[in-house]
């Protein structure tokens, strides 16, 4: 009625990962602990999309508290890959990736702490962006690791990803880590003359599936055909990324998840003897196995006897990883890497081998640690 043009995303069906607060709508983090939690406010990203007329169809499944890479640890059951129902969609934003791949929505919001947007996007054949840390407000995101978490979109293609990311970005007074950053814009030209594409050698070593290697190099040669120059770069510090990441992320998780104690909100057992028993029972029954595993790992790393030996060393590795990326970007404008060592694997393949699942994050966690 005002005569103004509607936003390009107005009326477009979308979905929201179930750890992003939605006023009046359950936000469970796929956990028994928050099975009946209903926020009284919207996350900033939800407010922004609501203001431009986006249509939210619902919340998407995920690994419990975003701790996983397969969306198999959800209290509400697994999500299957829409291309092959016997395989995982990736995680932890597997529900968002699957919803977009199945064309149930045009885009969905996810979160990425160590690859949780990029890996499921790869497994489901969609486009995922982890925005630079601080470019998108985290207000209303139920935290896993606050220094690493970032909200971003999963979409059908790159142009949609740019449009949604632009709508989400901007400084927010409710998030002190947020900043004003230039919104992404895809050029109309198809030539890439002058663009230097870095190929980090450390990302193409042992453990990378040959099919994945071939497809990434196919993409590299396509970029080269459009005028880009391929440049070999290296990041030897990458081999320390996984242990450092899991020390830091789990340490932050052990602190962030300490708020779920059965007293203020969340799961509360029907019977308990005293306050200590309430804490013990609420957390034992409210958290799943993987969440408890990571809380214990984080608490161990922060304990007085191991703080310097593990946590402080992991912080030093984090700083070295950032320097490694800085060195790469002196030679290249962008880096081309795999998102995961393999394609989507069968459901249950890593159920009894959490270390193997952790190693699947090798190509993604370093970006979060560098704040890129």
Predicted regions and their residues:
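Short, well-ordered beta-strand elements within core beta-sheets of diverse protein domains
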Residues: 15, 33-38, 149-156, 298-304
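A short helix-breaking turn/cap at a secondary-structure junction
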Residues: 127-219, 275-281
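Glycine/threonine-rich beta-strand-loop-alpha-helix active-site module
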Residues: 71, 111-139
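Short, solvent-exposed turn/loop segments enriched in Gly/Ser/Thr/Pro and often Arg
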Residues: 60-68, 237-241, 340
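Glycine/threonine-rich flexible loop motifs
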Residues: 27-36, 209-210, 345-356
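Flexible, low-complexity linker/loop segments at domain and module junctions
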Residues: 2-12, 183-197, 331-332, 336
